[in-house]
Amino acid sequence: MHTPERNRLTVLDDVIITVDDGGTITAIDPAPADTSGLTVDHELGPDVVLLPGLNDTHLHAPQWQQLGTGLDLPLEDWLFQHTFPLEQRLTDPVIAAEVWPHMVATLLAHGTTAVAYYATVSVATTTMLAATCAELGQRAFVGR
């Protein structure tokens, strides 16, 4: 399923998707009635839907570790008790080296293939995040 143009959803039933060794889709064709001569690496079941990767257009990377915490607090308390101290800790390259790979790998595992990240005030750890995205294969805009 995809959206080839605005406001138009197309569902492709019973197709063959050809992917090259680099992971790039090179063709999407209707499946022939006889597939015996084809090399099939992976066949999806009849109830499986294949979607393109998801895009997260606004992710504060330093807040990854506090996901779901402090939800009962007013915004100012949440910022000063959770967010700002954590963002300060993530200017440390040792801590960032532990957090960034876990975060990027988790997002990729859940289908998020592109992200616009807000990183830290540290050039070093912001650069580390960009390098992690490149290494793990996630498309990203990384800013601070």
Task: Label the model's feature ranges.
Residues 55-57, 115-117, 140-144:
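Hydrophobic faces of well-ordered beta-strands that scaffold small-molecule active sites
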